[in-house]
Structures are given as C-alpha cells and as structure tokens.
Regions:
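Charged, amphipathic alpha-helical linker segments immediately N-terminal to NTP-binding catalytic cores
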Residues: 1-16
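Residue-level signal for inorganic ion chemistry
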Residues: 10, 47, 68, 134, ...
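Conserved beta-strand/loop subsegment of P-loop NTPase cores
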Residues: 154-161
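ATP-dependent carboxylate-amine ligase catalytic core
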Residues: 16, 22, 26-37, 63-150, ...
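Non-catalytic interaction surface on structured domains
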Residues: 8-12, 30-40, 56-57
Length: 166
C-alpha cells in the first residue's frame, strides 16, 4: 500500500509541457550525488526485442559469474519488475524507501514518472559498483533519461522499425 501511494504522488509531478531535454533528470541526479557516474552499463536500444536481448545477456553474464542489475520499462505485472539488483527484483518495502528518497531530493519539482524511476534506479545501482547494469533505453536513446550515463560500456541495438527513423 505504501508503494502505491508513493507511485501515485510521483505521477502527479509530470510537467505540463513537453520538454525533451535531459535537464530535469540531470538536475535530480546532481542532487543525489550523480549516481549514474558510478555505475557500469550496457544500454539496449531499438524498436523490438530489447527485453528479450536483456534477458539473454543477463543469462550469459550470470552464467559467467557476473552480478547484474537490470532496468526495463514498462512493467507487466508490478513496478518491481523494472528494478533488478544483484540478480533479484527489489521488494516493495525497499522500492518504496528508494522512491521516497528520490522524491525528497526532487522537492516537488516537475519531472516525468520515468525520469524519477530512472534516477531511483541509478541511485540504487550505485550501491553495486561492480555489477553490470543492463539498461533498456527508449526514444531511440538521444532524449531518453538513461542517456546521461558516463560509463556506458557498450550499446546494443536491436531491430529498428520505421517509426524510429524520423
């Protein structure tokens, strides 16, 4: 119940105007100590097959004794699916506490729900500096909130549909 209340509050912060810049996510992450600069990531971009690609990479890395964190969007059953740390989904209580911490740092500023979730992911992922982060990126990466990573080890491009060629 606590998690649902926090999610509802965070969704109300959505800005009234569309702004495709990365200013909001950069500002929030700066308040959080720039956690995105402390993680090693592989970004997965494309129109189709991102989740399947992430799951295949996760299986390979896990078999090779790497610990992984995963950030995907959207979720199917529960928001927790988006947040995998040390090979395990984040439980409701830990996710609620994480989102509250990020909400407090944001201080009521307009921000998209995705940007809040992304900042929360970066903050938690920074607690696992040796893990490989498999991060699904949208908007063909350029204006996606995940595109503020400093230590992107690689980018994997899945199939590209015509809708992403404009």
């Amino acid at each position: 119940m606590k998690l649902q209340k926090i999610v509802s509050r965070l969704q109300e912060l959505h800005p009234k105007e569309i702004d495709l810049s990365l200013d909001r996510i950069q500002s929030l992450c700066k308040k959080l100590g720039n956690p995105q600069d402390k993680i090693k990531a592989i970004s997965i971009v494309g129109t189709n097959g991102k989740y399947s690609t992430i799951q295949a990479m996760f299986s390979i890395l896990k078999e090779a004794n790497f610990n992984c964190n995963i950030y995907t969007s959207p979720h199917i059953k529960s928001i927790n699916e988006r947040f995998v740390f040390n090979n395990e989904e984040l439980n409701d209580e830990d996710l609620a506490n994480l989102l509250e911490e990020v909400e407090e740092a944001n201080n009521g500023e307009p921000i998209t729900f995705f940007e809040i979730l992304t900042a929360a992911y970066f903050l938690k992922a920074s607690q696992y500096p040796d893990n490989i982060n498999l991060i699904e990126s949208g908007l063909f990466f350029r204006f996606d909130a995940t595109n503020i990573l400093k230590n992107n080890l690689a980018s994997v491009v899945t199939s590209i549909g015509l809708d992403h060629l404009d």
